[in-house]
């Protein structure tokens, strides 16, 4: 039994509903829509087969209902995530499923896991006994930028796909936030905890423990900036070491802040298209993290 036959067996309404989906009577269509909505994601799998229908009304309305179901799912998912802790990875992939509803999060988790395993094996092969965080970061840079060939998308900086984590991993390119996010997700899997830093018009990450403190500009091929180098830079603006830890835009960004900014980037893209419907939806989803 194929997938469609299985769905029809579980929901015998589907075939009768699809026959009525193009009805000119708006009342009938609204009832058909409500019925499909009640079946949730099962309806999405069914309706997708009608996107290319020869009947334009069937195709248009199938897509309309499909999009409503997907948005309702994302709305609940992101609202629930906003109350949890350590949600950044899942939230980023959930945002991507707004544009790519068929996205398989488990598959991308496995890709990130595999990258981390490969990198960890390389580190262990080179440093059998002891390895510093700085040495790990240098190997991570080599793996990320030269083996996996991730790079900043300077050619089409404002492309929407730069903000969708699945596409960043698929294409090996993205914007400062998305590239930094993939980088720190791999780093976290090998025991290095980075924090995001929301600096104006850019995004970098920071590592800090009792011994080390440094910044990494992932978008610019993982340039490592020591605290000493950062201090020297800020001295020209009259900011000295005693004030360094209180510089507002060098504070660790909370996960909500990072998610909010991912949405802000996407909203900017779709406002410029323009795509009012997407902007409205993204602003609603963004509001859970404001």
How should each PLM-predicted stretch be described?
Residues 1-290:
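A structural boundary/capping signal
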């Amino acid at each position: 039994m194929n997938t469609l036959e299985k769905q029809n067996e579980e929901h015998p309404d589907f075939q009768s509903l699809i026959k009525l989906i193009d009805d000119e009577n708006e009342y009938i269509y609204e009832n058909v829509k409500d019925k499909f909505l009640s079946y949730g994601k099962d309806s999405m799998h069914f309706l997708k087969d009608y996107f290319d229908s020869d009947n334009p009304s069937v195709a248009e309305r199938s897509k309309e209902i499909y999009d409503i179901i997907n948005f309702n799912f994302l709305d609940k998912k992101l609202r629930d995530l906003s109350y949890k802790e350590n949600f950044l990875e899942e939230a980023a992939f959930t945002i991507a499923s707004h544009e790519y509803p068929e996205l398989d999060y488990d598959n991308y988790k496995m890709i990130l896991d595999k990258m981390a395993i490969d990198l960890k094996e390389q580190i262990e092969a080179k440093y059998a006994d002891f390895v510093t965080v700085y040495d790990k970061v240098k190997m991570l840079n080599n793996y990320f930028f030269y083996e996996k060939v991730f790079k900043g998308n300077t050619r089409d900086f404002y492309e929407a796909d730069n903000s969708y984590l699945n596409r960043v991993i698929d294409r090996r390119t993205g914007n400062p936030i998305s590239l930094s996010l993939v980088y720190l997700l791999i780093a976290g899997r090998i025991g290095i905890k980075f924090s995001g830093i929301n600096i104006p018009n850019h995004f970098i990450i920071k590592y800090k423990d009792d011994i080390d403190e440094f910044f990494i500009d992932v978008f610019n091929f993982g340039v490592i900036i020591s605290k000493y180098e950062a201090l020297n830079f800020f001295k020209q603006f009259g900011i000295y070491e005693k004030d360094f830890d209180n510089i507002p835009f060098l504070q660790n960004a909370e996960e909500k802040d990072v998610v909010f900014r991912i949405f802000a980037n996407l909203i900017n893209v779709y406002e410029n298209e323009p795509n009012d419907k997407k902007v409205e939806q993204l602003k609603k989803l963004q509001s859970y993290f404001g």
